[in-house]
Regions:
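Bacterial N-terminal signal peptides
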Residues: 4-13
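Signature of the catalytic double-stranded beta-helix
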Residues: 113-126
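N-terminal secretory/targeting leader peptides
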Residues: 21-110, 125-318
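Sec/Tat signal peptide C-region and signal peptidase I cleavage site
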Residues: 14-20
Length: 318
């Protein structure tokens, strides 16, 4: 097993009681600890543990060193863990509709008001046995990064590391897709196993990928989605007071997205300083790219889940 720590946890109760009133939930993140897409979750844990003394606490087990990223969704489903920081791209095998989350760029509060969040919650309950507690990073876009410069919108001959987020658009542009865990990307780039990769605008410096990256294709596209999931059996077992601590912290966590605009600007400047050059193919190609990315993204979701995919697209407005 690649995560022996969790083999020991799998047979235990969902949460340990410190007292008659307090429960402790076990948490993992699907991204490396202390990196861009784990940091806010770690702040969330600190807030819960500060505000929830005597009510609810979170025991932070860690990241991919404890559990492979693509196992996290199933670990929530089967109650191996209680709460997780994970992107839907890592559990589309269990919930195909999770691939639509990248196409819904509205703020979380807007999604809560217009019914989008309710449908996403319903789908997680049905297919992942999970409560969808929070969504982060709606205003952080993705890019395709490359080590070979292109002069037209054609990926023929290029091997691009993907998750389900980028797979359809890379293939639509003629590229060959390669799937690896984030921890394997550096070596794949260094050895020429892949010519590029998809990743958000933020976070590559956490992983050292700037050392093996030459170009960033413009424009940015899609929206990052990192959710906080709670096993549904665990969620139902919590008291109203325990749920309130988690719900309040979840809304606070979603509010941290206001920090992202400054982070994105700083990241672009940092990439420029590191020698990562933008590839701008011009307005027509940029429009074609964005249109294709949106259309193939939705087509893939609707093909795998016709009814729910259509509902999600209608709610998304795009």
């Amino acid at each position: 097993m690649r995560f022996p720590l969790f083999a020991a946890l799998a047979g235990s109760m969902f949460a340990t009681a410190a007292s008659a009133q307090e429960v402790t939930l076990r948490a993992v993140t699907s991204f490396a600890e202390g990196t861009q897409f784990s940091k806010n979750f770690e702040r969330f844990i600190q807030k819960v543990n500060a505000d929830g003394k005597g009510v609810v606490q979170i025991n932070y087990i860690g990241g991919p060193r404890a559990m492979p990223p693509f196992e996290v969704g199933n670990a929530v489903r089967t109650k191996v863990i209680d709460i997780a920081n994970v992107t839907g791209a890592f559990y589309t095998n269990l919930m195909p509709e999770a691939d639509a989350l990248k196409l819904i760029g509205k703020p979380a509060d807007a999604q809560r008001k217009d019914g989008t969040f309710a449908l996403i919650e319903q789908l997680h309950a049905q297919k992942l046995n999970a409560h969808y507690l929070a969504r982060q990073f709606h205003n952080v876009p993705f890019h395709i990064y490359m080590n070979k410069k292109i002069d037209k919108l054609d990926f023929t001959g290029l091997k691009i590391r993907v998750t389900p987020v980028y797979k359809d658009v890379v293939e639509a542009l003629g590229g060959t897709t390669v799937t690896t865990a984030p921890g394997e990307v550096y070596t794949a780039l260094e050895r020429g196993v892949v010519d590029g990769y998809g990743w958000p605008i933020t976070g590559i410096f956490d992983l050292g990928w700037e050392k093996v990256t030459k170009f960033r294709l413009e424009p940015a596209f899609y929206s990052v989605e990192v959710g906080v999931l709670v096993n549904m059996d665990v969620w139902k077992s919590l008291t109203d007071a325990q749920k309130k601590v988690l719900n309040d912290a979840a809304l606070w966590l979603e509010g941290l997205d206001s920090e992202n605009e400054a982070l994105i600007k700083a990241e672009r400047d940092k990439q420029t300083a590191a020698g990562i050059a933008p590839i701008d193919l011009g307005p027509a190609a940029s429009k074609e790219f964005l249109t294709k990315a949106n259309e193939v993204g939705w087509a893939s979701v609707i093909k795998r889940s016709p009814e729910n995919g259509a509902k999600l697209r209608q709610l998304s407005g795009n």
